[in-house]
Amino acid sequence: MPRPAYRSRSVRRIKVRTPGGRTAVHYEKRAKGAPRCPITGLAIGGMNKKIYRFGVSNRAPTRPYGGVFSHKALARAIRLAVRK
């Protein structure tokens, strides 16, 4: 039986053929996707998904709600706020 940490479905299972001829199971973390806007579902522009060693403040755009909402959702929210 695998270790308790490997019983979770949050880790990928990869079957690997060993030099001895048997098949072993290797576990690895699932790849993270690009950050997405919670309103429109679009990928957030300006956010690099490969630079996870930096904090969000260093890799997010400097516009209001940068790194949280997409440009379309932000433009819609600004228009609604100005109209009120």
UniProtKB/Swiss-Prot annotation:
Could you tell me the keywords of this UniProt record?
A: Ribonucleoprotein, Ribosomal protein
- Keyword flag Ribosomal protein: yes
Residue runs in coiled coils = none
Task: Give GO BP annotations, semicolon-separated.
Answer: translation
Does Ribonucleoprotein show up as a keyword for this record?
yes
Q: One Pfam family from the UniProt entry?
A: Ribosomal_L34e
Task: From the UniProt annotation, give the residues forming the signal peptide.
Answer: none
Q: Name one GO molecular function term.
A: structural constituent of ribosome
| GO CC entries | ribonucleoprotein complex; ribosome
Please state which protein family the record places this protein in: Belongs to the eukaryotic ribosomal protein eL34 family.
User: What is the name listed in the Swiss-Prot or TrEMBL entry for this protein?
Assistant: Large ribosomal subunit protein eL34
Source species? Pyrobaculum neutrophilum (strain DSM 2338 / JCM 9278 / NBRC 100436 / V24Sta)
